[in-house]
Amino acid sequence: GDALAAALVEARGFTRGDFLRLHPSGQLGRKLSLRVHEVMHPANRVAVGQPETRVKEILLRMTERPLGAACVVREDGTLAGIFTDGDLRRGLEDNENLLSEPVGHVMTTEPVAAHPEMDLQTAADLMEQRRSQIAVLPVIEPATRQLLGLLRLHDIHQPALD
């Protein structure tokens, strides 16, 4: 239903606002009405480290806070990068001593990020409409790049929020 409606929205020149007003209860309506800050995991529940933190320590933090990624921040709290299982796999291909390396050597620098007022559909588009799809987005304050939290694709596609 929502996929067909989305195609009609595009074909007839409806804006996202028009669709939200006319179909607020569907999945797409939910994604257009909710903002990232309403469903993200706050920074205090995210695995976080600094560029010099060893990969082994980052992995332990990711085990304690299992969201699929760790955010890497500078001393001032600004986002330096993100470390995912993909970074781990690529790193292990090149370096069997990866666990003792600083995460800054293998993290993704300048990751795609969301801001707290972004609607969920825009965030989903950032993750899905790219050559290499991603499953998590750091959430940052746009003006300062301070880490605010983490958003997973899974969180966006949940049928309903409690």
Predicted regions and their residues:
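Short alpha-helices
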Residues: 1-14
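Terminal peptide-recognition signature
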Residues: 4, 39, 62, 77, ...
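Flexible, glycine/charged-enriched surface loops at secondary-structure junctions
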Residues: 14-19, 72-75
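Cyclic nucleotide-binding regulatory module and flanking cytosolic helices
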Residues: 17-40
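Bateman (tandem CBS) regulatory domains
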Residues: 32-46, 100-111
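The conserved cystathionine-beta-synthase
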Residues: 48-66, 73, 92, 113-142, ...
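Short beta->alpha transition motifs characteristic of CBS
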Residues: 67, 78-93, 146-162
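Nucleotide-binding motor/catalytic cores of P-loop/tubulin-like NTPases across gene-expression machines
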Residues: 81, 85, 96-100, 120
